[in-house]
C-alpha cells in the first residue's frame, strides 16, 4: 500500500525549517521524502494559501482573500480528486481545511474529529483558534497533533 503524506509548515521561514526539522531532513536524505519550495500567493495569509495549494487556483479565482473569508470551496481540490479516485484521505490541521473542503460552517462538536467514508476528507482531526486568548489556549500541542497524524497513518481495518 502506497501512502502520500503532505506536510505544510505554515509561518516557518524556509531556512529555519531546513535547519531545525532534523527528522524531516532525515527522510529527505534517505530518499523517503522530497522537498518543494513554494512561492506564496498574495495575500499570504494561511487561509488564502491553503485554498490555493489545494485547488491550484489563485485567490482571484477561488475568492479566499484572508483568514476571515471562509466557505466551502466549489472547485476541484486535492481531497475531492483523491476520493473520486477511490482512495482515502486524512487531515490533521486547522479548521479552515474542514470548511474549505468538507463543509461550512465548522461545528465545534461535529467537525472536530470525524470519519466520513464518502466525504472528500475521509478522516479529519481539526483544531481551531476560536476563543483563543492569553487566558484560554484552545490550540492543541504539537505533540498531540503529531500523535493524531501517526494514528491516521496506521493501517485502517
Spell out what each predicted region is.
Residues 3, 11-109:
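Active-site nucleophile/metal-coordination loop of metallo-enzymes that catalyze phosphate/sulfate
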Amino acid at each position: 500500500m502506497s501512502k502520500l503524506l503532505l506536510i505544510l509548515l505554515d509561518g516557518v521561514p524556509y531556512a529555519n525549517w531546513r535547519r531545525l526539522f532534523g527528522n524531516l531532513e532525515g527522510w529527505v536524505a534517505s530518499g523517503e521524502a522530497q522537498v518543494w519550495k513554494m512561492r506564496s500567493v498574495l495575500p499570504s495569509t494561511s487561509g488564502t494559501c491553503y485554498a490555493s495549494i489545494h485547488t491550484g487556483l489563485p485567490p482571484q479565482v477561488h475568492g479566499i482573500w484572508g483568514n476571515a473569508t471562509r466557505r466551502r470551496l466549489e472547485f476541484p481540490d486535492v481531497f475531492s480528486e483523491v476520493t473520486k479516485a477511490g482512495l482515502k484521505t486524512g487531515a490533521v490541521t486547522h479548521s479552515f481545511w474542514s470548511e474549505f473542503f468538507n463543509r461550512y460552517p465548522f461545528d465545534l462538536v461535529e467537525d472536530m474529529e470525524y470519519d466520513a467514508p464518502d466525504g472528500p476528507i475521509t478522516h479529519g482531526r481539526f483544531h481551531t483558534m476560536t476563543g483563543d486568548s492569553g487566558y484560554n489556549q484552545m490550540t492543541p500541542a504539537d505533540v498531540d497533533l503529531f500523535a493524531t497524524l501517526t494514528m491516521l497513518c496506521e493501517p485502517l481495518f
